[in-house]
């Protein structure tokens, strides 16, 4: 066991555990809308939870809509915030000499030469988007591609360049992020021209407040659960980078020990897919939350990151059903990102970089989000606690703390340990022996399911079925229970255990009468009923199939 634990420590400890501020809240300014009472309430709540000094909380009179004009952004938010930071001596702007390069002459840049803060948090009620000005024109914009000759932007993304306010940057199109891909989080600060801006936002003030609560819970207990990735299996060179990013993110999660599911089908995850205990979800490409995410309950774990790549995924944050960001937050995600308007693929976050920085490098959410963006002053909004750092504790420390509290989350730590060793090529027999000898396996649906999976991979179907049945008795989550029943049905069929398969699928429909893919289960039951010569049951299932089947297309 100690040998296996050492692999876990090496695999996940990373370069993450770097020095941090004694009180991270000192590095945050909190911004709210004085015209929205709930905005100040969210700001005060966050400041209390993260110990943000009261003189770093700023209120401005802003639009009460999600959109604001460019003029309002400049005069009511951008300039007043910059002035407030200067007045409170939170940063000091001065001249910085930028040496010449082979491609660019030397120049003087005005930006902060000292800064006490690195993050800005925009609270529920602060507008989301700077509106497009149809009459906008700017010198030099004719050099941009036609589709980039626009001045609308996410408020977050525009404010990220607040340290360069004296530079009078162009407004048309995106600005290159010179810190894209950085591996040293210390570079991500105003003295290098960037402010890490996120939002505590969502469909309701309560959802917004809950984001910091879940972040703090995950920092204390760890981010545990499963990782799901939804590819399109696309070959078009214009869109393939999206798949490449997501695939690379999935490989990172697999290597650090997440139970990882990768869907290669062009469509999104179907509604009936049993998506249990979600720690990470990254996918594309649908306009509105769909499939498992449109169900009444989604099993997001505390601290979960969920992101769906779509051009308008954050067109509004107020809806629980439209687009993606609002619904994901409403269903329990802790951190997410999205686009307020068409960004084009290269203008969206590189989720491979994001995942690597969050996990391998131990960045905070705010740091990882901005290290992953190739451009700023563009369309990405970043929603969640910027200080959230899910991989800030070493794995061995987390394991000790969870075990000392007799927390069931320790089961996930053991699961990650097994998965890391499996990826490293350890023999299945060794992993099976570890789980068989582990006392926690006897009481854990999570570990018993893994043990059953290993038996199946080892070619021991009877042992696998027995252990899947054991897992069903150990209080699995609803979605895990569905997955176990579906898996058992397949295993029974493979072993010609027709009666067992029949009873298994009946149990699924009995326990989950609203299962989204009820039609598929009824078809299986019809076939099994016919095979077992259960004529009345077969007639009933045929009637149910007729009722559930979509009508044929009109001629």
Feature map (PLM): residue ranges:
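Bacterial N-terminal signal peptides
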Residues: 6-16
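Cysteine-dependent hydrolase recognition
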Residues: 22-436, 441-444, 458-462
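Register position in tetratricopeptide repeats
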Residues: 423, 457, 491-494, 527-531
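Single-residue signature of alpha-solenoid repeat helices
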Residues: 430-431, 464, 501, 538
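Alpha-solenoid helical repeat scaffolds
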Residues: 435-436, 469, 506, 523, ...
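Short solvent-exposed coil/turn linkers within tandem alpha-helical repeat scaffolds
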Residues: 440-443, 474-480, 509-518, 535, ...
């Amino acid at each position: 066991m100690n040998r296996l634990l050492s692999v876990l420590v090496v695999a996940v400890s990373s370069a993450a555990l770097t020095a941090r501020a004694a009180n991270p809240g000192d590095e945050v300014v909190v911004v709210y809308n004085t015209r929205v009472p709930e905005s100040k309430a969210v700001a005060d709540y966050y400041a209390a939870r993260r110990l943000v000094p009261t003189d770093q909380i700023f209120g401005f009179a802003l639009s009460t809509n999600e959109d604001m004009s460019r003029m309002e952004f400049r005069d009511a938010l951008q300039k007043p915030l910059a002035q407030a930071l200067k007045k409170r001596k939170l940063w000091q702007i001065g001249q910085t000499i930028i040496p010449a390069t082979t491609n660019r002459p030397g120049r003087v840049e005005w930006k902060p030469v000292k800064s006490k803060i690195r993050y800005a948090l925009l609270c529920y009620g602060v507008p989301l988007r700077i509106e497009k000005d149809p009459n906008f024109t700017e010198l030099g914009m004719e050099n941009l591609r036609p589709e980039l000759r626009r001045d609308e932007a996410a408020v977050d993304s525009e404010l990220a360049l607040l340290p360069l306010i004296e530079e009078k940057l162009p407004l048309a199109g995106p600005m290159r992020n010179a810190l894209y891909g950085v591996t040293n989080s210390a570079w991500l600060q105003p003295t290098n021209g960037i402010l890490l801006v996120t939002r505590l936002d969502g469909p309701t003030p309560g959802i917004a407040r809950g984001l910091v609560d879940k972040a703090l819970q995950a920092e204390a207990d760890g981010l545990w659960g499963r990782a799901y990735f939804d590819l399109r299996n696309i070959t078009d060179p214009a869109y393939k980078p999206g798949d490449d990013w997501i695939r690379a993110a999935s490989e990172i999660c697999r290597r650090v020990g997440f139970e990882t599911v990768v869907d290669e089908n062009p469509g999104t995850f179907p509604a009936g897919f049993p998506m249990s205990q979600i720690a990470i979800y990254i996918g594309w490409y649908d306009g509105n939350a769909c499939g498992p995410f449109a169900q009444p309950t989604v099993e997001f774990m505390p601290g979960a990151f969920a992101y769906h790549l779509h051009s308008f995924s954050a067109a509004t944050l107020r809806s629980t059903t439209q687009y993606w960001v609002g619904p994901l937050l409403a269903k329990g995600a802790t951190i997410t990102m999205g686009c307020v308007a068409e960004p084009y693929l290269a203008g969206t976050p590189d989720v491979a970089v994001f995942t690597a920085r969050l996990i391998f490098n131990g960045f905070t959410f705010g740091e990882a989000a901005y290290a992953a963006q190739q451009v700023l002053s563009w369309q990405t909004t970043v929603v969640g606690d910027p200080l959230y750092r899910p991989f800030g504790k070493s794995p061995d420390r987390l394991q000790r703390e969870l075990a000392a509290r007799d927390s069931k989350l320790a089961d996930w730590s053991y699961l990650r340990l097994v998965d890391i060793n499996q990826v490293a090529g350890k023999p299945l027999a060794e992993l099976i022996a570890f789980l068989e000898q582990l006392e926690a396996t006897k009481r854990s649906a999570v570990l018993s399911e893994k043990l059953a999976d290993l038996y199946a991979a080892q070619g021991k179907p009877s042992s696998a079925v027995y252990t899947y049945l054991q897992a069903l008795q150990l209080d699995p989550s609803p979605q895990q229970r569905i997955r176990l029943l579906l898996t058992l049905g397949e295993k029974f069929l493979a072993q010609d255990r027709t009666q067992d398969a029949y009873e298994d699928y009946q149990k699924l429909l009995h326990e989950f009468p609203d299962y989204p893919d009820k039609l598929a289960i009824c078809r299986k039951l019809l076939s099994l009923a016919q095979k077992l010569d259960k004529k009345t049951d077969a007639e009933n299932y045929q009637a149910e199939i007729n009722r559930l089947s979509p009508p044929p297309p009109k001629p």
